[in-house]
Amino acid sequence: TIALIDSGIDRLHPNLQDNNLRLKNYVNDIELDEYGHGTQIAGVIDTIAPRVNLNSYKVMDGTDGNSINMLKAIVDATNDQADIINVSLGSYKNMEIDDERFTVEAFRKVVNYARKNNILIVASAGNESRDISTGNEKHIPGGLESVITVGATKKSGDIADYSNYGSNVSIYGPAGGYGDNYKITGQIDAREMMMTYYPTSLVSPLGKAADFPDGYTLSFGTSLATPEVSAALAAIMSK
């Protein structure tokens, strides 16, 4: 079982009907993925490890989540006996600010709780082109000790220019991008991006532009590299 801590999952998606979805919601009364991010992550996992059991822990309903919900979700996923916890989310905390330093320590404690229960935590490194192994700002949960922290590569295999990096990044996975000419011409090269699932109740502008049917989109980022690692680990553990 992979626990997905994200924006929820579209349980009505035709390709996710066999994944024995269990849903927990920390933000509102709406079970569906209102944002699309979590369904994209589930799509990557399902492509690599079809029909793996997915438990969804909805900690955000837009671009913002909060640390309290994420901490609760990691504890709940541990108590629910997940094998792997996938966190394709992250934030920066300044170690010189007391409240933020306490938040980092809280994340360390819940990560250690999961690891003591033999659960792997796989988390994204972030997309700000930063070295997350140095400086007063800590990236969490990706970047913490005992977390498998995942950066992103382009189609060519080179580290993506947006991907965070550093000595605490454990592995890099293929996650594409807008293409090498995007910064010069502003044109997106769809061939450089990843195709994945999208909520059937939402419209994906990139999916429409690519003439995909409802339920699919193009995307990229360390968020999508992370479930590649989670799914590969799940496939290995199932052998």
Task: Set out the residue ranges of the language-model regions.
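Extracellular S/T/G-rich loop segment that most often corresponds to the catalytic His/Ser-adjacent loop
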Residues: 6, 142-235
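Terminal peptide-recognition signature
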Residues: 41, 85, 114, 232, ...
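Structural detector of well-ordered beta-strand residues that form the stable sheet scaffold
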Residues: 27, 55, 120-122, 148-149, ...
